[in-house]
Amino acid sequence: MAKMYYDSDASLELLQGKTIAVMGYGSQGHAQAQNLKDSGLNVVIGLRADSRRWKQAEAAGLKVATVAEAAAQADLIQILLPDERQASVYEKEIKPHLTAGKCLVFSHGFNIHFGQIVPPADVDVFMVAPKSPGHLVRRTYEEGAGVPGLIAVHQDASGRAYDLALAYAKGIGCTRAGVLETTFKEETETDLFGEQAVLCGGVSELIRAGFDTLVEAGYQPESAYFECLHELKLIVDLIYEGGISRMRYSISDTAEYGDMMIGKRIITDETRKEMKKVLAEIQDGTFAKNWLLENQINRPSFNAIERKDAEHPIEKVGAELRAMMPFIKKPGE
């Protein structure tokens, strides 16, 4: 059974008197930094000098400096930049200030696991990964709760890396809900697989395929949108609350029979074989190599596919229907 840790297992005293530099002020950066600050810890945000987020961070009452300046004054350096930018920023602006006894912190293991960042042996390297988007990390903290998270230690130079990881997790509110001990390898590979095969890649293609099937058969696009996209949230909420069995308990017997009889015709043995290939490409570094190369050549495939998918009919129909639904929050609200 995996080991879980809670508030009683962690002490913020380990971080008292230390400076925590949070590099980046995006979804996770703003949430983790504000939670750490509200936990009574000393936080500085590291940003580019021309970053549009500089004033946002200052408005939230946070100290802001350039990445290099923040790294120089920090005892713990949390890198919350996009995966594809981390290695370059680390080499140029963080590594020169990563002196013995400091801690390097991550919320995703990509760059450590795939060898893009190789820290010196005399620093602690650990991960605290909230299993939630940043806005929920912040909101639940403010409500007195928290979101679950993962912790892992890659390098324990001080002999206290696990305790420091737990303290950091407590500072952002994750130990209120519980944190699971894992490894950089496990977090990285399972996270990428979940995104590609299920949560993002799998779901996106399933939705579009269902929509296309109905529209090509002559059904109204609006009806296809409701059946294949809009109602997905209702089903996912049930699964989130109590697993697949809870969802099946809550739907009609007709829907449950269709689930049991037809599901395996959609996710076939061939699909499962392809999932194993996807996982193998993550494990052997093929995906990481392709993604890093894609960024080095200015993302030609990424940009082309993004533009093409944005023009899919489901996007236009969805925008029109959502405009009629005042109960749906608009982006940015």
Swiss-Prot record:
Under catalytic activity, the entry for this protein gives:
(2R)-2,3-dihydroxy-3-methylbutanoate + NADP(+) = (2S)-2-acetolactate + NADPH + H(+); (2R,3R)-2,3-dihydroxy-3-methylpentanoate + NADP(+) = (S)-2-ethyl-2-hydroxy-3-oxobutanoate + NADPH + H(+)
Q: Which InterPro entries is this protein grouped with?
A: 6-PGluconate_DH-like_C_sf, KARI, KARI_C, KARI_N, KARI_prok, NAD(P)-bd_dom_sf
Binding sites annotated in the UniProt record for Mg(2+) 2: D191, E227, E231
Which pathway does this chain act in?
Amino-acid biosynthesis; L-isoleucine biosynthesis; L-isoleucine from 2-oxobutanoate: step 2/4; Amino-acid biosynthesis; L-valine biosynthesis; L-valine from pyruvate: step 2/4
GO cellular component entries? cytosol
Question: For substrate, which residues are the binding ones?
Answer: S252
The answer, when asked if Metal-binding is one of the entry's keywords, is: yes
Needed co-factor(s)? Mg(2+)
The residues that the entry says bind Mg(2+) 1 are D191, E195
Q: At which positions is NADP(+) bound?
A: Y25, G26, S27, Q28, R48, S51, D83, E84, R85, Q86, G134
Enzyme category, top tier:
oxidoreductase
The source's superkingdom equals Bacteria
What keywords appear on the UniProt entry? Amino-acid biosynthesis, Branched-chain amino acid biosynthesis, Magnesium, Metal-binding, NADP, Oxidoreductase
The UniProt note on the cofactor reads as follows: Binds 2 magnesium ions per subunit.
Q: Record's Gene3D superfamilies? A: 6.10.240.10, NAD(P)-binding Rossmann-like Domain (3.40.50.720)
Ranges of residues in domain KARI C-terminal knotted: 183-328
Q: Which HAMAP family match?
A: IlvC (MF_00435)
The entry assigns this protein to a family as follows: Belongs to the ketol-acid reductoisomerase family.
Role played: Involved in the biosynthesis of branched-chain amino acids (BCAA). Catalyzes an alkyl-migration followed by a ketol-acid reduction of (S)-2-acetolactate (S2AL) to yield (R)-2,3-dihydroxy-isovalerate. In the isomerase reaction, S2AL is rearranged via a Mg-dependent methyl migration to produce 3-hydroxy-3-methyl-2-ketobutyrate (HMKB). In the reductase reaction, this 2-ketoacid undergoes a metal-dependent reduction by NADPH to yield (R)-2,3-dihydroxy-isovalerate.
Under which name does UniProt file this protein?
A: Ketol-acid reductoisomerase (NADP(+))
The gene is ilvC
